[in-house]
Amino acid sequence: MSLEDESFPADELFEQLNSASIGASRQFKSQFGEHDQPEAFERNPAPFLTSDCSDESSFIDAANKSAKTCVSDPVGLDQCEEEEEVDKDFEDSALANGNSELQIKSARSSKSVSYQDIHSAHTKRRYKHVTSKVAKYIADIHAQDQQRRNATKKFQRHSSMPEYLTPTARERGAHFSVDELHNLDESLDNSSAGNITDAKTPNDSYERLLSENERLQNDKEDLKSYSDYLQTKLDEKAMENMQLRRNFDVLRTDLTDCKEKLKRNQSYSLRSLNFCPPASVPKATQTDHELLSHAPNISRLSNMVAIADSGTPLPGSNTNNLTYDSSAGSIEVALLSVAPAARQPNAGKPKKNIQPHSLDFSNDSTEAEPNGNGTTSTGHSSSRAITSRRGAAPNNSESSHPSSNDSAIEVEALDLRSPYHRQPQGSIYPPMQDWGHSDGIYFFDKRNSRVIEVRSINVSQSSNPEQNSGTSETNLLNQSHVQFRHKRTSMGTRMLRLLGPCVRCTDTNQSVNASSATYTIGLPLLREEYGGRHTDR
């Protein structure tokens, strides 16, 4: 649809305009000339400027007038009818004067004046259903303003009101508002004093206030008691937490102590495994009785050395029957059951070879009593001098039983290297200066009848002394008939296996009482002779 079809009049109108005479141009100018002058707008001001904008009614009237001037607004039909009447009058006058060309020019130039003039009634009727955007915008503004006015009437401020002034509290009838109380006071002032009904009203209100105050006090006390209850619970929880922490600390301390005790017990058990007692323990030995009888006066080692020197078996005894477990016999002497292997000389370990000295057990050594107790003879055996030195006879390498000439004891100075060394079933005595003026600790093994000299560690000694004595220790381990639990041997077990097990000799000529007796033989070594040997070295 083109603009000419909708916005301009029909073709018959243009034909009528063309047929008009040209003389009507002057009249057209006289009619529309005033629109070209600015004073025309001042003489005819806009209708919405004449009213006061501050007035609400004037604003609404101006909006209604502007809505009527809209093109598509169906309300503005009056203005369109007026415009149509003006157009008809203009056409009639133009046809009468014959100024058709001037009328056409003036009609086309009227666009600049108002675009509303070119719309025909047909166009307005056709677009009557279209809603104007301007009118809709103005209507929305009116609706929002009306909604805002209605909201202010319904708004009630309850945030700053007391509780008894809220509508909910007033519905319960328990309180009166300030206005109601003021009205009651005024009514009391205006009423007479003798009116009973007026006198009851303030009394009732006062009672209500007192009851309300009492209720508030009760609520306050309840809240305080509940607060105290919560505080008590909190204190109990805090005490429980403190007790739990204290118990945890105690348990942790106990656990640490138990761990330390367990470590100590494990270390002690490992040390105890280093020593294993022999399978068979003799009932009584010569050394046991000697230590029991001479324990307070023991200060020398000469008695045990004399036993070793005079440890020859009795006449008529069979040397092949000397075993470790032999029960027959009258004397037990500490002898070597195996021959020590050849070892390299070591300057750090001085060796003392004590020559054997024959003993006569029947005459001058000991006499057996019928009750089994032995008495020591006080003869001249202690003053006997050893005039000759005789080397110890070599033992039989193929058999673990000693020969008849094997009566020498080899006493070595050993080093105590293990700091945790333990020596059960024995006694350790402090160093003794009487025997050859040598410093050392002597170990008396009661169970195996052994005498061992233990010396302190020599710093200047070779760092590997175990390599020198490895062969002899291996032979002793293989032939000593003592069971050990571990392959690794300590210094304590080595010292206990140096001299070998005890042996007993049998004598068929002795009686039962004499054979069952235990002898204590004391033949000390002469100091002069031993001192001479010590100085000769």
Swiss-Prot record:
It is found in: Nucleus. Keywords: Cell cycle, Cell division, Developmental protein, Mitosis, Nucleus. GO terms for cellular component: nucleus. It comes from the Eukaryota. Residues 371-383, 392-406 have a biased composition (Low complexity). Has a role in localizing bicoid mRNA at the anterior margin of the oocyte during oogenesis, and a poorly characterized role in nuclear divisions in early embryogenesis. May be constituted of a homo- or heterodimer. This is Protein swallow. It comes from Drosophila pseudoobscura pseudoobscura (Fruit fly). The lineage of its organism: Eukaryota, Metazoa, Ecdysozoa, Arthropoda, Hexapoda.
